[in-house]
Amino acid sequence: YIGDERFLPAGHKDRNDQTINEIWLDNSPIPKKNIHFIKAELGLLEARVEYENTLKKNDKFDVVLLSMGEDGHIASLFPGHKYPENRSVIIEKKSPKIPRQRLSMSYKQLNKSTYVFKIILGQPKRQAISLIFQGYDLPINRVCGEVEKIFIHSSAIPVGGEQ
């Protein structure tokens, strides 16, 4: 299951499904029937309903793997944005990143997991890491499942007095 998708035409080079297929799944033994992408090309509302129905077939994830954006966002859940708490898939219409419209699993859905692994890489993430250590409420902090493991590459760890 994919956590989010950009609202772009099928096959567009900037869609998450394209990148995931090229880098990983095209060369993977995972059966295609076990791979579930968000069909953004259906339109925002239709794609949300379709993916919510897909997610209903699997009540809980064994593992959720998350990476974090420079601002502390995960999937397409951004700092300072309010999302419906009763949905498993949300529509983001004002993403601070292009494209503005996206579909994403909700916090509620991502938390339906036994294990949540968070991977944080790169110097541009240092400010967000600093905010996390200071207790700021960032999207990355809102998903933890039953067991949470955080992997922070040394390049992302603030050094000296960095804030």
For the regions a protein language model found, what residue spans apply to each?
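Solvent-exposed alpha-helices and their adjacent loops that cap or buttress functional pockets
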Residues: P29, K56-N58, L66, E70, ...
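Class I SAM-dependent methyltransferase SAM-binding "motif I" and its flanking Rossmann-like core
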Residues: V64-K108
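C-terminal functional extensions of proteins
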Residues: N111-Q163
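Active-site histidine-anchored catalytic micro-motif
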Residues: Y1-D4, A10, K60, I74-L77, ...
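Ligand-binding beta-strand-loop-alpha-helix segment within the catalytic cores
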Residues: Y1-L65
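Short, well-ordered alpha-helix to beta-strand connector turns
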Residues: K32, F61, R87, S113-T114, ...
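A short secondary-structure junction signal
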Residues: R48-V49, A75-G80, A128-I132
